[in-house]
Amino acid sequence: MILDTDYITEDGKPVIRIFKKENGEFKIEYDRTFEPYFYALLKDDSAIEEVKKITAERHGTVVTVKRVEKVQKKFLGRPVEVWKLYFTHPQDVPAIRDKIREHPAVIDIYEYDIPFAKRYLIDKGLVPMEGDEELKMLAFDIETLYHEGEEFAEGPILMISYADEEGARVITWKNVDLPYVDVVSTEREMIKRFLRVVKEKDPDVLITYNGDNFDFAYLKKRCEKLGINFALGRDGSEPKIQRMGDRFAVEVKGRIHFDLYPVIRRTINLPTYTLEAVYEAVFGQPKEKVYAEEITTAWETGENLERVARYSMEDAKVTYELGKEFLPMEAQLSRLIGQSLWDVSRSSTGNLVEWFLLRKAYERNELAPNKPDEKELARRRQSYEGGYVKEPERGLWENIVYLDFRCHPADTKVVVKGKGIINISEVQEGDYVLGIDGWQRVRKVWEYDYKGELVNINGLKCTPNHKLPVVTKNERQTRIRDSLAKSFLTKKVKGKIITTPLFYEIGRATSENIPEEEVLKGELAGILLAEGTLLRKDVEYFDSSRKKRRISHQYRVEITIGKDEEEFRDRITYIFERLFGITPSISEKKGTNAVTLKVAKKNVYLKVKEIMDNIESLHAPSVLRGFFEGDGSVNRVRRSIVATQGTKNEWKIKLVSKLLSQLGIPHQTYTYQYQENGKDRSRYILEITGKDGLILFQTLIGFISERKNALLNKAISQREMNNLENNGFYRLSEFNVSTEYYEGKVYDLTLEGTPYYFANGILTHNSLYPSIIITHNVSPDTLNREGCKEYDVAPQVGHRFCKDFPGFIPSLLGDLLEERQKIKKKMKATIDPIERKLLDYRQRAIKILANSILPEEWLPVLEEGEVHFVRIGELIDRMMEENAGKVKREGETEVLEVSGLEVPSFNRRTKKAELKRVKALIRHDYSGKVYTIRLKSGRRIKITSGHSLFSVRNGELVEVTGDELKPGDLVAVPRRLELPERNHVLNLVELLLGTPEEETLDIVMTIPVKGKKNFFKGMLRTLRWIFGEEKRPRTARRYLRHLEDLGYVRLKKIGYEVLDWDSLKNYRRLYEALVENVRYNGNKREYLVEFNSIRDAVGIMPLKELKEWKIGTLNGFRMSPLIEVDESLAKLLGYYVSEGYARKQRNPKNGWSYSVKLYNEDPEVLDDMERLASRFFGKVRRGRNYVEIPKKIGYLLFENMCGVLAENKRIPEFVFTSPKGVRLAFLEGYFIGDGDVHPNKRLRLSTKSELLANQLVLLLNSVGVSAVKLGHDSGVYRVYINEELPFVKLDKKKNAYYSHVIPKEVLSEVFGKVFQKNVSPQTFRKMVEDGRLDPEKAQRLSWLIEGDVVLDRVESVDVEDYDGYVYDLSVEDNENFLVGFGLVYAHNSYYGYYGYARARWYCKECAESVTAWGREYITMTIKEIEEKYGFKVIYSDTDGFFATIPGADAETVKKKAMEFLKYINAKLPGALELEYEGFYKRGFFVTKKKYAVIDEEGKITTRGLEIVRRDWSEIAKETQARVLEALLKDGDVEKAVRIVKEVTEKLSKYEVPPEKLVIHEQITRDLKDYKATGPHVAVAKRLAARGVKIRPGTVISYIVLKGSGRIGDRAIPFDEFDPTKHKYDAEYYIENQVLPAVERILRAFGYRKEDLRYQKTRQVGLSAWLKPKGT
């Protein structure tokens, strides 16, 4: 039996060690032959020599590839050739892998992250824990001396206890007279004795409880202090302590260190995980707890040492018993996974699945996919609809049964770009195949074995469930629908199939092996035809050396292109370098956006001239590619390819047309005649239209640049498949069908884009859950695989899975499913709920959590670069309502993928602030506990139990869920934020367009006549001419130049080119509105137009034109519609938001008057307000304490940007993204207007607006101010600032805020010693420089000094029940965002193995197909049992349902259920099987996944109900148990209600024994770290004040007394309760213990909380609920 493996280094080479137990003896085997390696996939095998030369450095040693080997592997089922690269040492791999991956010839590298010893187990097929060896186990535990404030391991170890099959003993160094105690002289001797015991007993397994994080570390520290060699390994080595996440893990070489704590934490849900609590939960027996202070007291006084020794012995004994209980399951898991028990017991479920698949992949010669990087992770985090859940039939039911459930042959021809017509079996991932839209990239190639019938349709052979599109027509429309191949055999398919007559022509053309030189010559000729010139010039000059005149013959080749056409420029350069060995010079053409590439060499000129003279004999596709890249464009409006030439170049268009005709590409040419400067001109246009022409161009020619190819692909996808009978690319064909038998490989392709491609010239379509995976062969390598005989198609989602051979995952799941069934049988046999949970854990691979935020939380979000503050619930609800058709559902979770949204976030590695894209919005229906987390700074956030904030552990930020956060914890908040910064221009037109039309009735726009006379009409005539509707105006050139300035057209030497037809069309609409509505205002020599008359068009006016206009009221003030947002405007806005007021009121003439007032008592401030207001709004009024802007335009501006009332004031959104000076100016104006200096010298900003308070925090963070606190009193929010701001100086020293210190707890955790106070960054640096702090450890905290994140302390955590929607975001890369009042960093949400985004074999299509089949089978089965067998289904979830026959007795229900099973299982396919899971006498169902049932043996099973926890009072537990029994055992709802009323009555009359009211809660941290004082903390603090030692782990047992004031003040230790003096608080126990324990259960029967109290007893009309519905 293999226990473990590792490796050591000998002479620089690795040696594998295998620790084994064989025939009862321990042995170590060595393997010196195994070499580290990984795989590399190369573009070209010739590059392997370059790869072999790559070097790196590791600790001064040069790392190289030792040797290489070419191997045949499969990647997702598809054969692939890769290079296996071997190295000298395992540590060489991480040193060199990135350099190899970055080599341009390397496509990717694989399996580089598998640890060497684990790799050895996989490659050699070795399975740990396999065999029948009996393992010797030894458990141990230590007791230590501790005084409050001491550093870890400062106190000595007092006792070491150990236990094995022979019993338990204790070693100590004080005299204790007990038979199982061995007494030695000193602590040193005690440890040496223990080491001797381990050596003599030589256990294979060392069992601890939290030994990873306590016992071993303590022993190691004490051994170092006492000079003891802590040798526990069988090779004489000391235990190896290594970090594993935020915890530690300890290895003992040659022995299995089995730490029970991580195993139990992941398998059993308990309120506390003390050894005592776990032992009682597992074995049902109590165990005495002796607290640390009691141990210390006993040791120092010598009294009660026997009790401590007994406690120590029992610790070792129960640890041994727990080890025996849990080790067999972990050993079984180790055998299944194929990795060591040490690894398996500390691994997450996802990692276990991964290691299992890695081993199986190697066995099947499959190359393992790489783990996703952060970018791929973000792409994967998408949701899909979950399993079917039927809403329950509420009430009490009898005689219930529960039933539950157990996916183109190789010579098919396809056209591949660059390869021509090949067999589908030869296609590789990354190839481009001929599809419905031309070339489409192959994402995956699937290969399977198949044996069975193929359907032959016109020569295309496919499996029966393969789909082909079929076209049917009637008088009105053409319809294209997919039909299964097997349907063609039934003659039910009416219509024609789609083929292409060009299949073989395109295949032949793309397969032509044209030499690169011919391709380059053709492209060069086409480029010169479009954009080039050949220049030959004779220049006479005087040769001074020879004293005579000479002639210089100059030859030059020039090509002029756009400056931004980088790909085109690079291609031209490449052509000249490859053909002529010369690099062209590049120069910019002044005043243009063009560059010219030049070569001035005679020999090059002559060669190029020869090429051009023979252009028609060159490779036509290459010539056309060059020409269209230079002079062609994709017209986005017409979705066509257009090339245009001027008057003298008709021959070029004719030549291009001739070449296109040779290739069979349909096109049109036409001539456009016009006059320019009195001369007749012609423009010759060639256009390729229609989907057929575009596809032929794309497949046979294509563009050079990716940009133009992308535009072409988009145009193709937007083109409809019209006129299929008369089409250059598609044809409609009748079909003939037959069948034949086939045995062999079948293939499928997964494509990017539309899932159709041509095969043989015919267009072709591209738990319960484990059982479905096996039945339907659901696997990444069977998904949408072309060429199979048979497919299973997932309902609704339409993904196809090849059935011709077993997929990688399904074939493995068969074994797992069999194992699962064995486990389920054991689960049925056990009556122990803990064992059930443990076994249930083993059959699950993934647990999906709903982690969310409450709807009212504030969220800053950037949309198109603008900052918005919204309630997270309002944002997500609105967007999901607006995009209802795009919302995906996964069970109770709704997901909407979005674009254009960003949120502030921090980089998890650097802790720097960043903006990150929001991938999806998430909404989840939730019922359960929610936690309001309040921070010391005044921030607060409300989250569900599973949602995470970021807290610090061992110097690193880690995710901590809501139910784990406690007062005193430190959580991440922003120090500073990086927002996009740019100069803004306030556009009043856009602002006014957002106001109601009635508000802009008297708003006008004006422009001076000068320079604009007749301009509007002239421009409109020119635009109509451009669109071919009028003759060319005489003055067209003037307007064309204006259009060129605006970027709509480009003028040429002759004529012009329209750059953007869509925008030009909109611009024309603007001028049609202006010409119709502009009038001349002679008094002011201006043109005037009413704003509302052009409201529909004015928004598209170019800014260059808009800045010439004025805007305002007809008879009043007008101003520029474009206002630069500078510091003056920002300060004015700050004044307004703080103490401004905008007013609209009726005037004496029954009209409206508008004004804006800015208030202040300081004359100097009023002077500044007046100066700023008059700058923007002209003349203003000055009052005693105000400045008034009596302008409507001013009112509209301030109202729309900033709000009116104090409660709805806000910061204009553009302020956040303005330059820092502008943001500071706003803050200065705000501070002067509504700020003050608090008596403690803090700056204070005040507002009644909660939104504004949050905005102020964000704005302050954006200028680097982090010392912010928030308060709220008398309806006013206060923002306190403890930093200097540029506009205010304070002379008093301030107390440091959280953002200015490193918390002492963090320092203690990192440096391992006690710090008495927090430390400033300056002091911290000095301590490091002075050598007082370890620099290496200090580096772990560098992010707290240099990063953009600081720590804020949790002050209180309040818990409440919640029913409703909760919300979350999926954020790219960083997985966090800012949310909550005052802004807190929250972790974003994660969404069995297929859907796990971090999985190597991730497959979203597989996951959603499995759930789709699940929904189909469960709904079909429910329909069958109800309609044919008379059952009523009461409740169902994803993989089973509860049903009964109303009125039938138990035996009838059982009999009919068995008959139905026989019937339905004959109909269900494959491994799917409906099972008889159990019969229940009675049950009730509350809501989804919340129910309780009782079986025939009286065993009650509950799911999802609020079952009381172990730390609730006995009266609550007892009442709930009695209520469940009354409902389920007696079937009596009235009795259940009576029980509750009786208990509440007894409580009210003080008739309940006090011992039933004791509440037990555990202290989880040092008392000084508790800021919020719950009852147990209040009691603990009072005990501590009396000298009682309280440590983390201490359980406080208390009772709450009647009285006034806080509950904590009325809670006392139970042993102090005196019935003669004290009365318990009956109301507290009723409201907080008894009613919560039963309320949710009885709510299912129509009862409310008030109905259950004896004081409010009343009859309710609930007779329908009171009788069992099954009777």
UniProtKB/Swiss-Prot annotation:
Output the Gene Ontology terms for molecular function: DNA binding; DNA-directed DNA polymerase activity; endonuclease activity; exonuclease activity; nucleotide binding
The annotated thermal profile of this protein reads:
DNA polymerase optimum temperature is 75 degrees Celsius, for protein cloned without inteins in E.coli. Both intein endonucleases are thermostable.
Catalytic activity as recorded in UniProt: DNA(n) + a 2'-deoxyribonucleoside 5'-triphosphate = DNA(n+1) + diphosphate
The UniProt PTM text for this protein says: Undergoes a protein self splicing that involves a post-translational excision of the intervening region (intein) followed by peptide ligation.
What's one Pfam family here?
LAGLIDADG_3
Q: How does activity depend on pH?
A: DNA polymerase optimum pH is 6.5, very thermostable, has a half-life of 12 hours at 95 and 3 hours at 100 degrees Celsius, for protein cloned without inteins in E.coli.
According to its UniProt entry, the protein's GO biological process terms are: DNA-templated DNA replication; intein-mediated protein splicing; intron homing
Q: Which InterPro entries match?
A: DNA-dir_DNA_pol_B (IPR006172), DNA-dir_DNA_pol_B_CS (IPR017964), DNA-dir_DNA_pol_B_exonuc (IPR006133), DNA-dir_DNA_pol_B_multi_dom (IPR006134), DNA/RNA_pol_sf (IPR043502), DNA_pol_B_thumb (IPR042087), DNA_pol_palm_dom_sf (IPR023211), DNA_pol_type-B (IPR050240)
Annotated EC: 2.7.7.7, 3.1.-.-
Q: Region 3'-5' exonuclease: what ranges? A: 135-326
Q: How is it used?
A: Pyrococcus kodakaraensis enzyme is a very fast, thermostable DNA polymerase (130 nucleotides/s) used in high-performance PCR.
Q: Where is the DOD-type homing endonuclease domain?
A: 524-665, 1132-1265
Give the matching SUPFAM superfamilies. DNA/RNA polymerases (SSF56672), Hedgehog/intein (Hint) domain (SSF51294), Homing endonucleases (SSF55608), Ribonuclease H-like (SSF53098)
- Entry's NCBIfam families? intein_Cterm, intein_Nterm, pol2
Biological role = Has high processivity, a high polymerization rate and high fidelity. In addition to polymerase activity, also exhibits 3' to 5' exonuclease activity. Intein encoded endonucleases are thought to mediate intein mobility by site-specific recombination initiated by endonuclease cleavage at the 'homing site' in genes that lack the intein. Given the high intracellular K(+) content (>0.5 M), PI-PkoII is probably more active than PI-PkoI in vivo.
What's the protein here called?
DNA polymerase
